[in-house]
């Protein structure tokens, strides 16, 4: 059994990158992983459909338990949907809407992916996390920033937003887990 510490914070003794990290910087996968950050400022245009399709295809190629693929994804780039839902959010959460630069409840993103899981399968949430990681890293590799969101999902599960959750048309039994803006 080998144990090692792992943190994104450099140790006090560390003054630069280790030799092993420097040696792999020419690896595009590692470069993508190391460059990824949560992005909260977006261009006003929706992600192009062909790029979104690539992101989704890479997501569904994520490892998953017993190949159950116990996830469902809905992508929304319809500004009416986002704006109408945001208006309800603002009525329910007026202080949140007072933030400087607030446009919508998804950090002003014009495209949002909603990921649902199957609570009848105990590994579904893990599978959904792996799906999302693939999607986020694919987007990063294409120069598209993203951010996982939980707050808007909590709101979407509220009675005030129930109609919009229903519009996502997830299969019976599936529950919204998180969103990616």
Give the positions of each predicted feature.
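Sec-dependent bacterial lipoprotein signal peptides
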Residues: 1-4
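N-terminal amphipathic, basic helical "cap/leader" segment at the start of enzyme domains
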Residues: 6-109
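Small-aliphatic-rich amphipathic alpha-helix that forms the alpha element of a beta-alpha
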Residues: 59, 119-164
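Proline- and acidic/polar-enriched loop/turn elements at helix boundaries
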Residues: 71, 151, 176-177
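Beta-hairpin (beta-strand-turn-beta-strand) motif
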Residues: 78, 88, 116-120, 151-152
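A glycine-rich helix N-cap at a beta->alpha junction
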Residues: 95-97, 103-105, 163-181
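Active-site-flanking beta-strand signature of metal-NTP-handling nucleotidyl enzymes
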Residues: 112-116, 180
């Amino acid at each position: 059994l080998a144990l090692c510490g792992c943190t994104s914070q450099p140790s006090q003794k560390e003054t630069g990158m280790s030799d092993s990290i420097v040696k792999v910087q020419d690896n595009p996968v590692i470069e993508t992983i190391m460059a990824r950050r949560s992005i909260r400022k977006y261009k006003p245009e929706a992600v192009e459909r062909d790029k979104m399709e690539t992101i989704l295809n890479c997501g569904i190629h994520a490892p998953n338990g017993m190949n159950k693929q116990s996830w469902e994804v809905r992508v929304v780039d319809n500004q009416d949907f986002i704006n109408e839902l945001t208006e309800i959010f603002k009525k329910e959460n007026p202080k949140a809407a007072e933030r400087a630069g607030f446009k919508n409840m998804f950090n002003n993103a014009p495209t949002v992916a909603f990921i649902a899981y199957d609570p009848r399968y105990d590994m579904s949430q893990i599978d959904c996390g792996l799906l999302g990681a693939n999607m986020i890293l694919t987007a990063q590799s294409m120069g598209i920033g993203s951010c996982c969101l939980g707050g808007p999902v909590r709101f979407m599960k509220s009675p005030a937003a129930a109609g919009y959750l229903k519009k996502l048309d997830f299969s019976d039994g599936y529950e919204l887990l998180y969103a990616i803006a």
